[in-house]
Amino acid sequence: VLIAVGWTLRVAGTVLGLAGAVIFRAGFTSDQLPAGLTQALWWLRLLGSGVALVIGAWVFRAGRDFVVGGKQHTADIIDSFDGLRGTRYLLYLRPFSTDADMASLPSEIAGGGSDENVFFASGLTHEETLVRRFRNFGRVVAIGRPGENLPLPGAARAYLPLDDWQDTVSGLIEGAHVVMLSAGPGPGTVWEFTEALRVLPPTRLVLLAYCDRAAYDRFREAVAEEYARRSRTEPGAPGTGRWPPLPVLPDFPPPFRPERPRWEVWLNGGRSRLRWDFVLKGLVVFGPDWRGDFIRFDPTTLRLPNAVTLRRLVRRELRPVMDQLTRLPTA
């Protein structure tokens, strides 16, 4: 019911908002401007269309929130991890502190743009977008945040106790076709990375950079400390008992063009659009020798960033990653 109501509100808000935007802009064409800007009808039309645009945007956003709420009630929940044995699944690991951001909806289309572009923003949460991108490789599963009332849309959720989770997560990592781990300096995430390093072939690990450079650098430092501690006190890889060498995590790449010429700023309608960045800044994939490669989705490489060129950029940068994952043997 919530999903149906949400879609109804989305459509109604889009129609109302776009109609208001069109009428508002039309009021400023040369043949519509009244002499001296004194005609009451012109002012009423301008006010009414502006109100319609604002109300339409509000209804549209409310509709999207209703859809997300409905998806939470119909989300995929895993009752037992035993059912995953022998199946092909992708394990999505992340700091629980990022759940609110990952469950949010994009407020604009890729690259930003005019106000009415909000009506064309995706109705998928950031986690749903991630799951949709990789779901062809297997079912995407995640550990649910302890204490949450409803699972978030996206990966199928299973729940673990707060004080007894590491052995289960280790088994899930070892059995996963691919592990997608969102970088973050928290102790749980850092332990999960070192555990993936211990039990997983390097080509099965994908490190997601939803964070900025500072958080990524803190993650690298925390990983080095945790690796030093665990490699001294705990057994290494199954079968050999030895820990693989700690991989050198690549630097977070700086923008390709941090400064833009004035003509590009003018052509893009100001600096705000040129400051736009992806929520998923990039990802790190590893070769057989644990050599990491940071693939940055960098909008500054484009002179005219827009929804089409940005989509092509991501698809182009992801192609070698998808090829590597396609070649993986079944776990």
Language-model regions: role of each:
Residues 91, 178-182, 206:
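Structural motif
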